[in-house]
């Protein structure tokens, strides 16, 4: 029958039993005693009362993060500022147009003679990987000052730094900025023409020049649109060979070339284009005497804050600020703002964030950006950009988005090549890429992803184009601190809930049942809830989910493995009658315990829901359970009678018998919004349930085909093969069933994200959470194998995050 709890349990129960404990309860029993002894770390969570409010430090950190939305700060680029400093006055070629930029260079040289920025120096224990960027910035600054006869002492110190650190120019362990192998040698040639005396290691210099020649040869022979744009982007490194007139076709409405101050400055030096000059004036008017590596970058900067908050699990504290950013981004998207549609990272991030937050954005603009990326300046050489585009391309909602699916495959291949080739120099980024490839967004539990994101959070994070740059949300210690505090706070609550769950299990005598040998079952049932909707205020919903999940597991065992037909019918009759004397009406000890526990659980959940909803919903929960029991009984009868249903008959029953109804539907009443009787009778409610359940059912049928075929049971796989005359192979059938599942999953996500909806968004989210659960455990061909699951559960429930680990 395959239900979500069994997905978690049955694959390798012996291994699970040997690896997991459950907490001791006040009532000692053989079951609870055996659950207590394991290798999991023992933790004592703080008392619940202490978890109800945040510390002053927590609130202060929130306040500082909220201010990020108002600043739009970016780090200054020495490299780009130096190129702006080289720009001559439009009125006199002998005078600098932007003398303040030159004064900034004079004021910002480092004691070692370089023009490094703070982010060039590692804040972790690992050495900096940005030395090539520092070399470029330093040499560009020297050239700018020398051009106008300024800072002879600064120039001498800078030249000395270059001589001492020149070996980094060919160090393959260093991160190479885009175009470095062309631009840096070109600047060295220019320095030689100016008789700047650089005593450089000849071996390293020859190696560097050979790299330049090979890169230029490759670009010349390639002749593709990608290469043409790439060469335009690094135009300042092409010198007199460059046809600047042809480059101007890439000029944007704001006058820039690629929103790059350095490229735009070089273009003005060559052509005296007034729009280029106006762009540079605009940048300096905004930032003062120095410029960033990319301008404008406001939309991307704001979206990065939103994305970091969401991925770190703390977005719920900034809902007002986030809503404002999303509304403004959507307005810019509809207007075709160049800051979005002309920048791959911004477009990918905007598309993903807007679509996942319910804004109606078509994939057309995004697809064009992805296609253009292969003819854009090095975007596919930037792993961060490729990863962002890949994440966005996963969000396929409509049947006609075939091109989006193609681009998703293409981007996935690129990331796989980067991963297998070992070319990702940042260990954090490498882990992030691996996580994205291993677990699609629809097959990753929220808490698992949040923990990984926190662990991969890089306090030295920066982006690399021609030069490196940072944003306020990159490596922000406040974001890291708040996310760790919140994660550990929620985790402590989850551990306390698990203790309560343990008591409930024993108090309901479920440990006495023979199939309770699967002691770890309830551990996993709770984990699925805590790992998907984690907020402290959702405690009642988590407990309802977990308890009903465990009950469905045990009922499924009765119908699928251990029970007699008499016991099955007796249990159904007891639920239908409800008010019965269990001492006389139950046909077995097993049924008595099951029914008593089920009744108590339904009443308990119903009472909690009554308090929130202001009306009784107990009868609805009973109906949900009866629907499941009748569907399970029908499958037993089909197998007994060797009845072959039509596919429609099978689907009609099988989506109910997959047993997600009692887990998800009662919990909807406990997440906050009011659910009226009209809502739960609406077609949208039933569509959400069916789509979610069919995803699980189809994946289960693929995985369980051989076993159920051997047991004489039918499922979607066997019916599909039969309906095709038995002439297709199981491998072909698997591909078809997987395509059905893909359609159901996309339809479900589209319905969940639909803004104009009958069912409240908080309730719809639970359907998607469960869909993610079942996809996770069927994500890999061999299933989410038990040892891996053990490790994930251990991390999510038991291992707090320690800040000193980062």
From Swiss-Prot:
Organism: Isodon rubescens (Rabdosia rubescens)
Residue ranges that the Swiss-Prot or TrEMBL entry lists as coiled coil: none
Entry keyword Transit peptide: yes
Residue sites binding Mg(2+) 2 per the record: 556, 560
UniProt subcellular location: Plastid, Chloroplast
Sequence motif DDXXD motif, residues: 556-560
UniProt binding sites for Mg(2+) 3: 700, 708
Sequence segments annotated as region (Disordered): 33-56
Gene Ontology terms: biological process: gibberellin biosynthetic process; miltiradiene biosynthetic process; terpenoid biosynthetic process
Domain notes: The Asp-Asp-Xaa-Xaa-Asp/Glu (DDXXD/E) motif is important for the catalytic activity, presumably through binding to Mg(2+).
Keywords: Chloroplast, Lyase, Magnesium, Metal-binding, Plastid, Transit peptide
EC code: 4.2.3.185
Swiss-Prot/TrEMBL cofactor(s): Mg(2+)
Protein's name according to its UniProt entry: Ent-atiserene synthase KSL4, chloroplastic
């Amino acid at each position: 029958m395959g239900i979500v709890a069994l997905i978690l349990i049955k694959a390798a129960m012996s291994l699970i039993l040997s690896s997991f404990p459950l907490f001791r309860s006040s009532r000692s029993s053989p079951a609870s005693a055996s659950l207590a002894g394991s290798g999991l770390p023992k933790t004592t969570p703080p008392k619940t009362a202490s978890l109800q409010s945040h510390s002053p430090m927590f609130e202060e950190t929130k306040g500082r993060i909220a201010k990020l939305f108002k600043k739009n700060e970016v780090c200054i680029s020495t490299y780009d500022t130096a190129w702006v400093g080289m720009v001559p006055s439009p009125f006199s070629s002998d005078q600098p147009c932007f003398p303040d930029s030159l004064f900034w260079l004079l004021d910002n040289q480092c004691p070692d003679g370089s023009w490094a920025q703070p982010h060039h120096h590692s804040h972790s224990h690992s050495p900096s990987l940005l030395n090539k960027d520092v070399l470029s910035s330093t040499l560009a600054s020297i050239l700018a000052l020398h051009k106008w006869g300024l800072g002879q002492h600064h120039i001498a110190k800078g030249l000395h730094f270059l001589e001492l650190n020149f070996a980094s120019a060919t160090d393959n362990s260093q991160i190479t900025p885009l175009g470095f192998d062309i631009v840096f040698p070109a600047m060295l040639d220019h320095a030689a023409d100016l008789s700047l005396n650089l005593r450089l290691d000849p071996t390293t210099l020859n190696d560097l020049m050979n790299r330049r020649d090979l890169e230029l040869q490759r670009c010349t022979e390639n002749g593709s649109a990608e290469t043409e744009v790439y060469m335009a982007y690094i135009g300042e490194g092409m010198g007199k060979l460059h046809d600047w007139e042809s480059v101007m076709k890439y000029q944007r409405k704001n006058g820039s070339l690629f929103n790059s101050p350095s490229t735009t400055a070089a273009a003005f030096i060559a052509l005296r284009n007034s729009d280029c000059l106006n762009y540079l004036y605009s940048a300096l008017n905004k930032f003062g005497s120095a410029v960033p590596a990319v301008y404008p970058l406001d939309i991307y900067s704001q979206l990065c804050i939103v994305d970091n908050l969401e991925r770190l699990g703390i977005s719920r504290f900034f809902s007002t600020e986030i809503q404002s950013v999303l509304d403004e981004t959507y307005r810019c998207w509809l207007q075709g703002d160049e800051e979005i549609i002309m920048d791959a990272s911004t477009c990918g991030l905007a598309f993903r964030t807007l679509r996942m937050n319910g804004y109606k954005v078509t994939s057309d603009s995004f697809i064009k950006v992805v296609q253009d990326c292969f003819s854009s300046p090095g975007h596919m050489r930037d792993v961060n950009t490729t990863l962002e585009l890949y994440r966005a391309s996963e969000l396929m909602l409509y049947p006609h988005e075939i091109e989006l699916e193609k681009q998703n495959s293409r981007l996935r291949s690129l990331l796989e090549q980067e991963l297998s080739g070992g070319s990702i120099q940042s260990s954090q980024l490498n882990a992030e890429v691996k996580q994205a490839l291993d677990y699609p967004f629809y097959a990753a539990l929220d808490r698992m992803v949040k923990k990984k994101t926190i662990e991969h959070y890089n306090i030295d994070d920066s982006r690399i184009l021609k030069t490196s740059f940072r944003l306020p949300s990159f490596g922000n210690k406040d974001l890291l601190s708040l996310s760790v505090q919140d994660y550990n706070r929620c985790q402590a609550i989850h551990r306390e809930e698990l203790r309560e769950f343990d008591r409930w299990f024993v108090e309901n005598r479920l440990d006495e049942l023979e199939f309770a040998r699967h002691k770890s079952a309830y551990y996993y049932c709770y984990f699925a809830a805590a790992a998907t909707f984690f907020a402290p205020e959702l405690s009642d919903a988590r407990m309802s989910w977990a308890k009903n999940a465990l009950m469905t597991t045990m009922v499924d065992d009765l119908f699928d493995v251990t029970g007699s037909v008499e016991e099955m019918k007796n249990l159904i009759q007891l639920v239908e009658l409800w008010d019965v004397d269990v001492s006389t009406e139950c046909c077995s000890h097993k049924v008595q315990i099951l029914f008593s526990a089920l009744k108590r659980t339904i009443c308990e959940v119903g009472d909690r829901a009554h308090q929130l909803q202001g009306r009784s919903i107990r009868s609805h929960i009973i109906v949900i359970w009866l629907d499941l029991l009748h569907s399970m009984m029908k499958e037993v009868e089909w197998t007994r009678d060797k009845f072959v249903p039509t596919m429609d008959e099978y689907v009609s029953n099988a989506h109910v018998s997959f047993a997600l109804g009692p887990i998800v539907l009662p919990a909807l009443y406990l997440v906050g919004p009011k659910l009226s009787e009209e809502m739960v009778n609406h077609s949208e409610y039933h569509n959400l349930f069916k789509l979610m359940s069919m995803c699980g059912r189809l994946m289960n049928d693929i995985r369980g085909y051989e076993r159920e075929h051997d047991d004489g049971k039918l499922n979607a796989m066997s019916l599909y093969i039969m309906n095709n005359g038995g002439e297709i192979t199981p491998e072909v059938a698997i591909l078809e069933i997987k395509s059905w599942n893909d359609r159901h999953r996309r339809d479900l996500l589209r319905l969940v994200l639909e803004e104009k909806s009958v069912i409240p968004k908080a309730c719809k989210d639970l359907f998607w959470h469960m869909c993610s659960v079942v996809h996770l455990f069927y994500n890999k061909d061999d299933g989410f194998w038990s040892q891996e699951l053990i490790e994930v559960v251990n991390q999510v429930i038991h291992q707090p995050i320690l800040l000193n680990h980062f």
